[in-house]
Swiss-Prot record:
Protein name per the record: Olfactory receptor 2T2
Record PANTHER family: OLFACTORY RECEPTOR
Localization: Cell membrane
Annotated InterPro entries: GPCR_Rhodpsn, GPCR_Rhodpsn_7TM, Olfact_rcpt
Cystine connections: C98-C190
Organism (species): Homo sapiens (Human)
Glycosylation site positions: N9
PROSITE patterns: G_PROTEIN_RECEP_F1_1, G_PROTEIN_RECEP_F1_2
Length: 324
């Protein structure tokens, strides 16, 4: 379908929300808004800490800062509109707004898939080839990894968004979701989308399996290397280096596995919305918290910054007292 078809489709959609008719919309708004603020704050703090503390100017933390940037944009794609809909009776989203939401969502989730895979490779090099780490993970390689993650993630967006929005939507304009997720949008189409859904399923599984293969191979080599270590301290450091990444991967890929791998018989609109809420709202909050709570370097950098702020405040108070 060409431009004429797109123009015929260019009318507003209606989002039903996370809960279609919430009994306490104010309470739901407060919960989601609190999570949103914590997620944005935690990710921005992580980015600033990595930028400010010279001890964190390493490839691992550079990649972690990029993950925080992705998480910050990721949660801003869906949550502000969701919060607006909780307070407003007008829950519409424009055709263009829906298309933009789909494109950014696919780009960010795909980008995170690839970035988490490349972060596993970084851990593999650090544990298995520590002497060659500066060479194998130099600045050019890190930049290539980040650009590759964004480009790889955007492939899904560029391929799937135009096709999805080209279908004729002649049924209800009501999307049973809190944002424009492709399966929910396709249910409004009055044409057979089964072939496209099969191809989309294969595309998403491929996007999932490529980085998952990198993660699996990397951690297999890490486990073999750790097993051969004689030093208990060396083993502890190796596991400490990888534990935060493993937790983040488990959370993110667990939700993605449900969405992209399980057959349609397991899916219901209610389940889909809960899982989507988990990895679009909760995951961006959990990622920086997991890394900050389980990582001594990040915790030390945070204490250092807080200590500076406390010292500066004490000096200001003392100066004011002297002047008084």
């Amino acid at each position: 379908m060409g431009m004429e078809g797109l123009l015929q489709n260019s009318t507003n959609f209606v989002l039903t929300g996370l809960i279609t008719h919430p009994a306490f919309p104010g309470l739901l708004f407060a919960i989601v808004f609190s999570i949103f603020v914590v997620a944005i704050t935690a990710n921005l703090v992580m980015i600033l800490l990595i930028h400010m503390d010279s001890r964190l100017h390493t490839p691992m933390y550079f990649l972690l800062s990029q993950l925080s940037i992705m998480d910050t944009i990721y949660i801003c794609i869906t949550v502000p509109k969701m919060l607006q809909d909780l307070l407003s009776k007008d829950k519409t989203i424009s055709f263009l707004g829906c298309a933009v939401q789909i494109f950014l969502y696919l780009t960010l989730i795909g980008g995170e898939f690839f970035l988490l895979g490349l972060m596993a490779y970084d851990r593999y090099v650090a544990v298995c080839n520590p002497l060659r780490y500066p060479l194998l993970m130099n600045r050019r390689v890190c930049l290539f990894m980040v650009v590759g993650s964004w480009v790889g993630g955007s492939l899904d967006g560029f391929m799937l968004t135009p096709v999805t929005m080209s279908f004729p939507f002649c049924r209800s304009r009501e999307i049973n979701h809190f944002f424009c997720e492709i399966p929910a949008v396709l249910k409004l189409s009055c044409t057979d989308t089964s072939l496209y859904e099969t191809l989309m399923y294969a595309c998403c599984v491929l996007m999932l399996l490529i980085p998952l293969s990198v993660i699996s191979v990397s951690y297999t080599h890490i486990l073999l290397t750790v097993h051969r270590m004689n030093s208990a301290e060396g083993r502890r450091k190796a596991f400490a280096t990888c534990s935060s990444h493993i937790m983040v991967v488990s959370v993110f890929y667990g939700a993605a596995f449900y969405t992209n791998v399980l057959p349609h018989s397991y899916h219901t609109p209610e389940k889909d919305k809960v899982v989507s809420a988990f990895y679009t709202i909760l995951t961006p909050m959990l990622n920086p918290l997991i890394y900050s709570l389980r990582n001594k370097d990040v915790a030390a950098a945070l204490r250092k910054v807080l200590g500076r702020c406390g010292s500066s405040q004490s000096i200001r108070v003392a100066t004011v007292i002297r002047k008084g």
